[in-house]
Amino acid sequence: PAVGPDRWGDIGLVPTGLTVDRYVEAIEVREVNDIPADVESSTVGGRYIFHHMTFSSGALSEDGTEIEGPSTRWPIHEVGRNADLFPEKAGRLLRANSALHLRASHVHSNGRETTGHLEFGFKFYPLGYEPEYRRGGALLGNGVDIDVKPNLADQEFHSYSVLSEHTKI
């Protein structure tokens, strides 16, 4: 609706149609909507309905209802974000028979009836490309127990992990 609460949540799975594994060199996500170009807005967010969204990809189950096995996490989509380029020696894998899992989305009301969707653009490395480095990451901290006090400057949160092998950061 033109005026209503923001929507937060999972959008679901979108099959990619890929028939072979491909490594991604760059990705861009952009919103396409029916907001007229001549409509004024006091913020860039007023021109869009998707504020941000996290997403991942992985091979679809046989019945196409879920992602099975390892998944690839992609950079968050957010208003004003440019394309993400991955280092030459560290492309990310988009698997054959995969789907994008559109997760934590935040869609907001902009005061007018608006229809919109997201388009995903992938630039692939040539067939046969194998990355020299693999992407890794450790989940640090505990988001449940973070206590941010209102109206208090200079708050800090520390979280540490020991690397188990030589790592390029």
Whereabouts are the PLM-identified features?
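Beta-strand-centric surfaces of beta-sandwich/beta-rich domains
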Residues: P1-K168
